[in-house]
Amino acid sequence: MKCVFIYNPNSGKGKIKKKKDYIYSRLKEKFDEVEMIATEYPKHALELAEKVCEECDYLIFSGGDGTFNEIIQGIASQEKRPVIGYIPTGTVNDNARNLGMSKNIKKSMDIILQDKQLNMDICKLGDQYFSYVAALGSFSAMSYATKQKNKKLLGVLAYALNGMDDLFHGKNFDVKVTLTDGTVYEKNCAFMGILNSKSVGGFRFNKEADIADGLIDFVMVESKMKNEKPRSFVSGLRIFKMFLRGIKAKRDLKHVIHFVSDGATIELKDNVVWCIDGEKGDTGSKKIEMLHHHVKVIVKE
């Protein structure tokens, strides 16, 4: 069997680059052939993943949630898709929480070599694939708007500081969501998230999520309640409370609407920017599809 290992040499303060010989030796315990490839520029992991699909049985990679998305983007449209394994070295690592992977390289390598596989769902928004979240509105731009040097220096705190502006100046948007069964939700929102994840932004606010059940979680935070003027600060606090309490705490979160579906059409009046797996995406109205059990991924036993 052949394994390709793709790694971002700059992720995790260069930790993977220092440990690549160790990773190679561990992979050789299982695979007859191991090829190590370092990414050299943005979206390179996507290009590499797409290229190696036909030639490898396993695709192991390291990086943050952005790298995870690039790998998914690269393999999801291919007819032959290798089993993927992940060593998290990013700042937040939401995908790692879903899979039970560790930032400790030895522990992650142990899990990868145990080779317990899960048929993971993948979502498609327009022509973009994503593994765990697509979002609109306040705080959704934090991950891609935060400078890389600040992430390295401050970690998760860098995201929090970058999001303070949204707390006071977040913009609301009108959205109409039509589910595959015909149900319609039409609201003025401060935030909307489309989730296939237990964790987003480091917050485990969707603990009951199953990344292989064929269903997508939708959560909308209304920006205006009855007899209330829309205020970005109030809306921001509502979003923050939702992340802290979880989307199931409906008694305390009357402004939060949560529902599930296997797909939807999302209509936006304005060209609001999408955040896809923590990266800047397209703008405007989109169709979302669920690709059930689309990718085999290694998970913790």
Where are these regions (language model features)?
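Short Gly/Thr/Asp-enriched flexible loops that form oxyanion-binding sites at enzyme active sites
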Residues: 67-79
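Gly/Ser/Thr-rich active-site loops/lids in small-molecule metabolic enzymes
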Residues: 150-158, 202, 208-231
